[in-house]
């Protein structure tokens, strides 16, 4: 891989444009747009994050014994985002209750949204790229602002501001978990008709945690909060299709949910060591995958070489050691007396084609499990195909969005880790390979990674800095596109 120089950022606010031609970065109260092929600056804006008049009035009237904070951090950008066509971009300051919008083609054009008395928790683009969703404080409402008409549409009482909502894959419908008169309901809104309410129907949940719409757009999965391990499948018409609750209830609810890219399966796991897989025909469990403390010889087991970073001085790459025979996996024993024990499924993610499911368990923080799933024409026998054992806890792992068998992970050090099944031997046979790649930078511990939409580049982020990584040979293709 080729690595770029290190650049500043704040709050991990770095994002590729949907076409992967630009990189948007927030540095305190400034926005910077760079070309992704040369990293040269093409646009910069100094964002006005000063509170709105309403926010200032409320702040001046608020009576509190605590001293007011005048820290400049309170005026920093907290959210950024690209419109779907990369023409517009937003920068929000939740503390100030303002959202600023800019045009990549016209540096002089700008728009500003003042959240008002209800405050601002989160702002993001709608799929149409011309509407912005603003979530208020205290779960009061969601406001959809249209850049085309300049009007606002209000939806009252969302259950959560950071979850519990989704768009259908085609962007036509907006689904939102709401609470009215102490009852939880699901709202379906038509985005093509100014977010007009299509229907409301009651939810079977007592305290909904979140929801996820299937890739086909026909079903929505809704699950309970930490008091109960229960998941429901509903149609967008409001019909309850199925429900699932293991017996006995392992407690603390569901942590991770992931739809198969085709919508054929739904994978989810809680605070125990099990992953349940439901199929979309009967909505019944077809397989339960469990964390294995001892992995058999039939599984490819890869271990990070000891001391490789010091031996290579953080430059170049080195293959993982492939272990022979069955191996024990380092698994910690969680403290179940604590409110949030370090246990259970912390991440589930399917690859592009749905032939692999990546899973990470919090009580096995150094391990990545890769399960292989058959295609529609093969017999259904999912199995643990590969295990990656790292020297340090894995912070994040992400599948390549365009290639089926390409995974990248980071562990908070000056390295990234890759797994791929795309290697070809001298005999022309395909095989898998795991590698550790040093990042040639003295002050960049990779704590977060983001793929470019075209799958040819990576953003590697530390607390207040980032760099890009591109595969050797892919950069020329990127420039030609």
Model-inferred region functions:
Residues 1-481:
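Long, low-complexity intrinsically disordered regions enriched in Ser/Thr/Pro/Gly
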């Amino acid at each position: 891989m080729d690595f770029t120089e290190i650049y500043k950022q704040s709050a991990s606010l770095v994002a590729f444009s949907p076409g992967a031609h630009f990189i948007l970065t927030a540095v305190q109260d400034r926005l910077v747009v760079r070309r992704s092929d040369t990293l040269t600056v093409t646009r910069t804006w100094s964002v006005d994050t000063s509170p709105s008049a309403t926010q200032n009035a409320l702040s001046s009237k608020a009576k509190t014994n605590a001293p007011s904070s005048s820290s400049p951090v309170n005026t920093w950008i907290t959210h950024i985002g690209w419109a779907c066509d990369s023409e517009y971009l937003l920068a929000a300051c939740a503390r100030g209750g303002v959202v600023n919008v800019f045009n990549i083609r016209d540096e002089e054009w700008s728009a500003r949204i003042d959240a008002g008395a209800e405050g601002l928790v989160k702002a993001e683009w709608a799929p149409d790229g011309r509407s912005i969703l603003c979530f208020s404080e205290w779960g009061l409402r969601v406001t959809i602002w249209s850049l085309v008409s300049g009007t606002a549409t209000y939806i009252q009482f969302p259950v959560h501001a950071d979850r519990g909502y989704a768009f259908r894959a085609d962007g036509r419908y907006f689904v939102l978990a709401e609470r009215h008169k102490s009852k939880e309901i699901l709202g379906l809104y038509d985005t093509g008709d100014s977010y007009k309410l299509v229907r409301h129907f009651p939810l079977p949940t007592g305290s909904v945690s979140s929801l996820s719409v299937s890739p086909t757009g026909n079903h929505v999965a809704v699950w309970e909060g930490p008091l109960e391990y229960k998941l429901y499948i509903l149609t967008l018409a409001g019909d309850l299709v199925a429900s699932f609750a293991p017996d006995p209830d392992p407690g603390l609810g569901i942590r991770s949910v992931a739809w198969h890219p085709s919508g054929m399966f739904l994978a989810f796991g809680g605070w125990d060591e099990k992953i349940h897989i439901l199929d979309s025909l009967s909505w019944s469990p077809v397989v339960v995958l469990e964390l294995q403390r001892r992995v058999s010889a039939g599984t490819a087991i890869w271990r990070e070489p000891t001391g490789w970073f010091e031996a290579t001085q953080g430059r170049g790459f080195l293959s993982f050691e492939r272990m022979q025979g069955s191996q024990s996996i380092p698994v910690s024993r969680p403290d179940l007396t604590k409110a949030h024990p370090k246990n259970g499924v912390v991440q589930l993610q399917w690859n592009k084609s749905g032939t692999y499911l990546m899973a990470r368990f919090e009580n096995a923080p150094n391990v990545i499990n890769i399960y292989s799933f058959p295609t529609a024409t093969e017999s259904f026998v999912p199995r643990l195909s590969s295990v990656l054992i790292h020297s340090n806890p894995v912070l994040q792992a992400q599948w390549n969005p365009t290639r089926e068998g390409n995974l990248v992970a980071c562990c908070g050090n000056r390295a990234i880790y890759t797994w791929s099944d795309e290697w070809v031997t001298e005999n022309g046979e395909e095989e898998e390979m795991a590698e550790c790649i040093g990042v040639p930078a003295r002050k960049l511990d990779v704590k977060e990674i983001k793929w470019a939409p075209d799958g040819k580049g990576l953003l590697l982020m530390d607390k207040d800095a980032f760099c890009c990584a591109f595969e050797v040979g892919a950069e020329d293709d990127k420039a030609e596109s």
